[in-house]
């Protein structure tokens, strides 16, 4: 099978090539996004491999179909960028990687949490300038504090495991409670309760039409003053404009974002010599209590190996006509 891989970075290429030694696919790597204009580059390929910011809308899928593509392989868990109804109508099979390394994402979320709480990012900049003042660096002891986790799939449960180690009170919301989470002593509550009682809120749910801008002005109004929010899931779970207002009135005490709702034109590229045109992003990133990372929570050697293994195994199953547990349509 010939496979076109889009949005490729060197780390993608390295691990896919390593894993492919046991599959023998013909891999063609492209560093640009899959769009309606670039879909023609998949000509002659039975499958395409895409990432979070690639375009899987109906026009793109129709173009891929014209060029002989049969399979769409997402090398990520989220699939909100793919029109599944259109894929089904066109007879395209879509597969994903539902859980590559839950601990990797959870550990990154914890890293953001600790950095924001203890102002490590600010202390780092100060000490580089020989400023060893501790003013403005006071954090809070996490032990005993209530932490709310929204979404208790594998990543959410991994997050709860770590938070339990901190001795925090564990609150969670998920329409489908997890037995693994309950074994940790998690208290499932509704969203208003989670919002009003949590000192720290961490997002670990997929993006769906129903939870678009889950954290909006109304949600922020229900939260404690000075709440910490960390999002390593999907950017559009947070209304960025509403977050700016909540930061201004100090409803949000600190905000960690590994994802951003308009990240498609920013993340995964070096923009250090560009003038960022996204005014909302610029306002957020200018806040000392906002920490951005560029969608890197997944980026560990173990996760990249797992992603590559699952992606190629998914395609192998489809090619052989075998059942694929990660098939979406």
List PLM regions with ranges:
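An N-terminal-biased, well-structured beta-alpha scaffold segment characteristic
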Residues: 1-95, 216
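A short helix->loop->beta-strand "cap" motif at the edges of active sites that frequently abuts
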Residues: 66-71, 90-92, 168, 225-227, ...
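Glycine-rich nucleotide-phosphate-binding loops and adjacent flexible coil segments
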Residues: 230
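Phosphate-binding beta-alpha-beta segment of Rossmann-like dinucleotide-binding domains, i.e.
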Residues: 90-92, 98-146, 158-161, 165
């Amino acid at each position: 099978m010939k496979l076109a891989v889009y949005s490729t970075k060197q780390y993608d290429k390295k691990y896919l090539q390593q894993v492919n030694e046991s599959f023998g696919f013909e891999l063609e790597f492209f560093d640009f996004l899959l769009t309606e204009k670039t879909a023609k580059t998949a000509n002659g390929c039975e499958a395409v491999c895409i990432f979070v910011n690639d375009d899987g809308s109906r026009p793109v899928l129709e173009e891929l179909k014209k060029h002989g593509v049969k399979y769409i392989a997402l090398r990520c868990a989220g699939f909100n960028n793919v029109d599944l109804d259109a894929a089904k109508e066109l007879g395209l099979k879509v597969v994903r990687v539902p859980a590559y390394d839950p601990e990797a994402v959870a550990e990154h979320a914890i890293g953001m949490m600790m950095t924001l709480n203890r102002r490590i990012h600010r202390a780092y900049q100060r000490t580089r300038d020989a400023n060893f003042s501790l003013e403005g660096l006071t954090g809070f002891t996490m032990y005993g504090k209530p932490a709310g986790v929204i979404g208790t799939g594998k990543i959410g449960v991994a997050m709860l495991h770590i938070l339990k180690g901190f001795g925090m009170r564990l609150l969670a919301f998920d329409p489908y409670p997890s037995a693994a989470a309950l074994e940790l002593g998690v208290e499932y509550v509704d969203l208003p309760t989670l919002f009003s009682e949590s000192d720290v809120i961490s997002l670990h749910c997929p993006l769906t039409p129903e939870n678009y801008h889950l954290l909006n002005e109304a949600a922020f109004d229900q939260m404690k003053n000075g709440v910490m929010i960390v999002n390593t899931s999907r950017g559009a779970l947070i209304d960025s404009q509403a977050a700016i207002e909540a930061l201004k009135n100090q409803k949000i005490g600190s905000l960690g974002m590994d994802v951003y709702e308009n990240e498609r034109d920013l993340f995964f590229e070096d923009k250090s010599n560009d003038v960022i045109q996204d005014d909302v992003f610029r306002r957020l990133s200018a806040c000392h209590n906002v920490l951005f990372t560029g969608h890197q929570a997944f980026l560990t050697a173990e996760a990249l190996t797992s992603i590559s293994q699952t992606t190629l195994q998914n395609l192998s199953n489809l090619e052989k006509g075998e059942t694929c547990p990660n098939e979406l349509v």
